[in-house]
Amino acid sequence: MAASSTRLRCLYASSAPAWKKSPSQSIISLSRHYATTSSTTPSLNPDESSSSSSSTIPKRRKTTTFRDKLNAGPSFADFVTGGNGNNASLDPEEAYALEKVMIPGPAGRKKEHTRLPSWLKTPIPDSTNYKRIKKDLRGLDLHTVCEEARCPNISDCWGGSDKSAATATIMLMGDTCTRGCRFCSVKTLRTPGPLDPHEPENTAEALSRWGLGDDLPDGGAHHFAETVIKIKQKAPGILVECLTGDFAGDLDMVSLVAKSGLDVYAHNVETVEALTPHVRDRRATFKQSLRVLEAAKRAKPSLITKTSMMLGFGETEDQLWDALRQLRASNVDVVTFGQYMRPTKRHMAVHEYVTPDKFELWRQRALEMGFLYVASGPLVRSSYKAGEAFIENVLKKRRGVGNTPGAEVASAKDVPVDVLGK
């Protein structure tokens, strides 16, 4: 009976008029009213409160500076048309100017940063062939200049399927260099660790698996010779190019490598003579590099000699002309031009991003001077798209029609046993 009376009192209270409601109900209504975000003055009358709240329109949120900038910014049509209202493209000078941005910082410490032009951007490597080569390199404990020097063409070279694109640059004698050039990202150490005695065999094994045209940058002539011999024994048809250092001016070591059975002897002068002291290691000179290329040609006249130069250090046209004349006088057959790209902030800054048109101009000039082949472009590197098919045809003509590129294969007895054992 008590429960029934309680329920009846609740029903009576809910249906009673406002003036008969208890003071406690008015207080509850008032507290609920204050809990809302309405800016109107709260009323003690529940009916008045509900009617006023239902008719209240919420205030519009205050606009912000960011929203104003966003609304005043470019529309989707501006992005499609390039922001100039039409489909006209920018010339290289205008595009280059837009790539320069100012990095914020404290007063007096702001820096101007130049972003990479569009013609220097390459895809991220992710092909099946790329992964296969990388897996083999790790399994055989081999190193490549492609990775150590952060080459932008690694996706194209390792991921290619045809002979001209499938190129890997094996780096002999470990992944560390004893010199410290200001443009190179390869690790440097005054006294690297001992040589891996299995490296020549592993290199030959890797090349026989891949069937690539390979370059072998290294600083040890004896290690070079043994590696070339083993490669030619396992795969005589592979076009072998050795990119060597200057052997500290020891031309006997240059001759040893030149006679080991390789097809192309490459040694890079890197830049013009005037900038060499500022760009390369202090132990390297332009004249010494010329002597290396000349010695290789004397040791084996049918050998193709090759060098590479980077543009963008601040070289002048007169300096480039002078460098090409000296290279041609040294009987160099092939020259390549590429854009210098700064590996890290610790290395030399880029003075200029040379346009593709200018690279093409220097290609034509070099060909007119009598070079057999010239590869010139922003992404060209010493071993990238350097005319393997063209060079192979030249070698066939020099050795006689019908001979394969590996016809002149050296044997172990051609190199002194005591030299190979060192």
Curated annotation (Swiss-Prot):
Cofactor field: [4Fe-4S] cluster
GO MF term (any one): lipoate synthase activity
Polar residues composition-biased segments: 37-48
Keyword Glycosyltransferase: no
CDD domains hit by this protein: Radical_SAM (cd01335)
Top-rank EC class of the record's enzyme: transferase
SUPFAM superfamilies: Radical SAM enzymes (SSF102114)
Gene3D superfamilies assigned to the protein according to its UniProt record, in alphabetical order: Aldolase class I (3.20.20.70)
Chain residues that bind [4Fe-4S] cluster 1: 146, 151, 157, 383
UniProt-annotated stretches for the region Disordered: 37-70
Pfam families reported in the protein's UniProt record: LIAS_N, Radical_SAM
Record keywords: 4Fe-4S, Iron, Iron-sulfur, Metal-binding, Mitochondrion, S-adenosyl-L-methionine, Transferase, Transit peptide
InterPro entries assigned to the protein according to its UniProt record, in alphabetical order: Aldolase_TIM, Elp3/MiaA/NifB-like_rSAM, LIAS_N, Lipoyl_synth, rSAM
EC number: 2.8.1.8
Catalysed transformations (reactions): [[Fe-S] cluster scaffold protein carrying a second [4Fe-4S](2+) cluster] + N(6)-octanoyl-L-lysyl-[protein] + 2 oxidized [2Fe-2S]-[ferredoxin] + 2 S-adenosyl-L-methionine + 4 H(+) = [[Fe-S] cluster scaffold protein] + N(6)-[(R)-dihydrolipoyl]-L-lysyl-[protein] + 4 Fe(3+) + 2 hydrogen sulfide + 2 5'-deoxyadenosine + 2 L-methionine + 2 reduced [2Fe-2S]-[ferredoxin]
Pathway field: Protein modification; protein lipoylation via endogenous pathway; protein N(6)-(lipoyl)lysine from octanoyl-[acyl-carrier-protein]: step 2/2
Location(s), subcellular: Mitochondrion
A GO cellular-component term linked to this record: mitochondrion
Cofactor note: Binds 2 [4Fe-4S] clusters per subunit. One cluster is coordinated with 3 cysteines and an exchangeable S-adenosyl-L-methionine.
Predominant location category: mitochondrion
PANTHER family: LIPOYL SYNTHASE, LIPOYL SYNTHASE, MITOCHONDRIAL
UniProt name for this protein: Lipoyl synthase, mitochondrial
